[in-house]
Amino acid sequence: MKTEALFETTAKPVEMKRSDWLLGVIGILKPRETSLLVFIGFCSAVVAGGGHPEVGNLGLALVAITLGSAGANGLTNYLDRRVDGRMQRTIRRALPSGLVKPPEKVLPLILALLIAGLALAWLLHPLAFVAGLVGTIAAVIARKTWATHILGGVSGAAPVAVGWLAIDHSPGLPLLLLALLIMVWVPIHVWSLMMAYREDYLKAGVNMFPVTRPVSQSIKVFPVLSAALYGLSIGLWQAAGFGWFYFALANVLGLAVFLASLRLLKTGVNRDAWRVYKLSAYPYLGLIFLAMCIDLWL
């Protein structure tokens, strides 16, 4: 009887701490990625305001971008949960690991964030709402088409558009170039990650470029995209009227990404794909948007 009682006691599953569950929910919203999107949205608003945007609209725009970006990131996490569960890199995420279950539990929160973000965007300006809505739709349908990462670029450009249109209601060439910068940046960033974990993606059954092509072919796209990214950043210097500070940093960052892409083209190894991925994240995107603001404040 004692042995049986002991067995019953030790066999009970350990209850999940509420704090672990809460951290899991926060993780689904991808706070690091969301913070980067909010930051570039903030910088876009600063540029639209000539360095000094109206504080009330800026604050409302930041709340809208935060809510919308968190909701969109949560939605992509939810839609990708099955693929994430088949990959070593992502299997420990909250949804595939079962930390938050059933997965549908997070949908009300995700939808509430998206609706709240879009509602605030509408209060700012109808064009800001349209930008947020297009970004949300692109995030949803991206998983169902070959143009996944092109639509991902559209979704990624939404915070920039919302931030700009919250301050300046007349979109022009600078906003177009900012959006194009993001749309070119997204495939560099995402595809380099996929190349770094190519075998993991293939084992998970991900049938899309670049992992479906031979490495020697797929890596050729990186110098081309990096050159386009570099060109867009310099075009933005002209269109937005930035000064020497932005010009200098845009050249340094653009060359860094381009040279890293050339190295990947030369070696074709996972390590160099990972370097392109890491360099293109906060070091490139964060710094080049920060340079725009500093240039206007100097």
PLM regions with names:
Residues 258-288:
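Interfacial loop-to-transmembrane junctions
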Residues 39-42, 93-94, 151-168, 216, ...:
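Small-residue-rich segments of transmembrane alpha-helices in multi-pass membrane proteins
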Residues 4-22, 78-100, 191-219:
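Cytosolic, membrane-interface loops and tails of multi-pass inner-membrane proteins
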Residues 66-75, 137-141, 179-198, 252-264:
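Transmembrane alpha-helical segments that form the membrane-embedded catalytic/substrate-channel core
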Residues 99-169:
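Intramembrane alpha-helical segments
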Residues 39-81, 88-89, 114-117, 129-137, ...:
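Membrane-embedded alpha-helical segments that form the functional core of polytopic membrane enzymes
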Residues 161-174, 229-236, 284-298:
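Hydrophobic alpha-helical transmembrane segments in multi-pass integral membrane proteins
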